[in-house]
Regions:
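Terminal helix-to-tail segments of small alpha-helical proteins
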Residues: 17-19, 81
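Short, small/polar residue-rich loop motifs at catalytic or cofactor-binding pockets
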Residues: 1-4
Length: 90
């Protein structure tokens, strides 16, 4: 699995950051974990999400997780050097 980090911003401006988890019994993408952290903290909606990865951009499941809390959220995908690779709609 490619190393990755993600962050999401909720409607109040709070930011939740996460890194991918790859344990034998638990695997979660950075974007999934950031959305889960926002949801468990009581966020009502998401305004934006960002994924930094040396691998491919967010997959359909990542985008669906963002869409669950932020149907209009913009998702940015960047390389580790900060180069913006894609701007997507959840």
């Amino acid at each position: 699995m490619a190393a990755e980090g993600a962050a999401v911003r909720d409607e109040t401006g709070r930011t939740y950051a996460a890194a991918a988890v790859a344990l034998p019994s638990l695997q979660m993408s950075a974007l999934h974990l950031a959305v889960a952290m926002a949801a468990s903290s009581g966020a009502a909606t998401l305004e934006a999400a960002a994924l930094v990865s040396d691998g491919p951009g967010p997959n359909a499941d990542d985008l669906a997780a963002v869409r669950d809390l932020g149907p209009a959220a913009v998702v940015f995908h960047a390389a580790p050097d900060g180069t913006l690779l894609a701007t997507l709609r959840a």
